[in-house]
Amino acid sequence: MFNALVVDKDEESGKTQAAVKQLSLTDLPVGEVTVAVEYSTVNYKDGLCIGPGGGLVRKYPHVPGIDFAGTVENSSDERYKPGDKVVLTGWRVGEAHWGGYSQKANVRADWLVPLPEGLDTRQAMAVGTAGFTAMLAVMALEDHGLTPGHGPVLVTGAAGGVGSVATAILAHLGYEVAAVTGRPETADYLTSLGATQIVARDEINETVKRPLESEIWAGCVDAVGGAMLARVLGQMKYGASVAAVGLAGGAGLPATVIPFLLRGVNLLGIDSVMQPYANRLRAWERIARDLPMDKLEAMIRPATLSDLPGLGADILKGQVQGRVVVDVNA
């Protein structure tokens, strides 16, 4: 028997309830690799899946957790053997498939990557989907020509998971980072990660008044979307790129095409769920190299399985700073 966070749904009321329960290996879905999970984390999607589902969870009972890291116990795939350390992010695990809020997991071998050299399983989950997405965003900006000499890079939702890691990576790479936050109390935290400028959310979270404003930003990692993204597009330098990674501020985009047509601005969509294996390895190698471990440690908030219902609600309200690392065995 082992512990897992199980979400059940009352069919009559439609309400969901999450609680730590004991399961057996026979309860797990079929998979090629059985992993003894050591750590997981909390992302925005996890908050949706712990709570009402947000349209992501179709079948109950369900075990959420879109990320996990641990040790292989059994494998029918020759790529992995017992004792191997592995990481999983994406592939709709924790949404359509049972996830990492459990001491055991059965998954497809194709969904795993080896634990990157230089990271332990706890650090890998401090990174998690949020940090993996942040690295993909930085890589996309670099692939579109961004270098530190081009000017300041804006990070929206900077105190959240994606924003925190993006800020730390960009600062380490020598960029001038402007961090947007709606919580003034996070300014010292963001400065400690390497931000050189703190931008109040209210300054930039307005509906577009003019399609083009002064050219300010050489690049942007946007975790907010909505009106803020629309406003930022009009402030980008000529030929600059915005990597869109989230929708904390809404899925709409009340913008015009003028920044694309007159300034050649690029809007880059970043998906972390279905990334090919080679890209995953490249991103994790970059994370191990370009994310300072002392900065990562400063982001970590420890948690246990029993903390998850509350944390799921908090992250949906934008009240979680940095990265939550869940010790599923504590």
UniProtKB/Swiss-Prot annotation:
InterPro entries: Acrylyl-CoA_reductase_AcuI, ADH-like_C, ADH-like_N, GroES-like_sf, NAD(P)-bd_dom_sf, PKS_ER, Zn-ADH-like_protein. The gene is acuI. The zinc-binding residues of the alcohol dehydrogenase family are not conserved. Homodimer. One of its GO terms (cellular component) is cytoplasm. This is Acrylyl-CoA reductase AcuI. Induction: By dimethylsulfoniopropionate (DMSP) and acrylate. Disruption phenotype: 25-fold increased sensitivity to acrylate, growth is strongly inhibited by 20 mM dimethylsulfoniopropionate (DMSP). It is an enzyme of class 1 (oxidoreductase). Keywords: Cytoplasm, NADP, Oxidoreductase. NADP(+) binds at Y44, A159, G160, G161, V162, T181, G182, R183, R201, L247, S272. The lineage of its organism: Bacteria, Pseudomonadati, Pseudomonadota, Alphaproteobacteria, Rhodobacterales. Probably catalyzes the NADPH-dependent reduction of acrylyl-CoA to propanoyl-CoA. Restores acrylate resistance when expressed in an E.coli strain K12 acuI deletion. Its main location: cytoplasm. It comes from Ruegeria pomeroyi (strain ATCC 700808 / DSM 15171 / DSS-3) (Silicibacter pomeroyi). GO terms for molecular function: acryloyl-CoA reductase (NADPH) activity. It catalyses: propanoyl-CoA + NADP(+) = acryloyl-CoA + NADPH + H(+). It comes from the Bacteria. Its EC number is 1.3.1.84. Belongs to the zinc-containing alcohol dehydrogenase family. Acrylyl-CoA reductase subfamily. It is found in: Cytoplasm. It holds the Pfam family ADH_N.
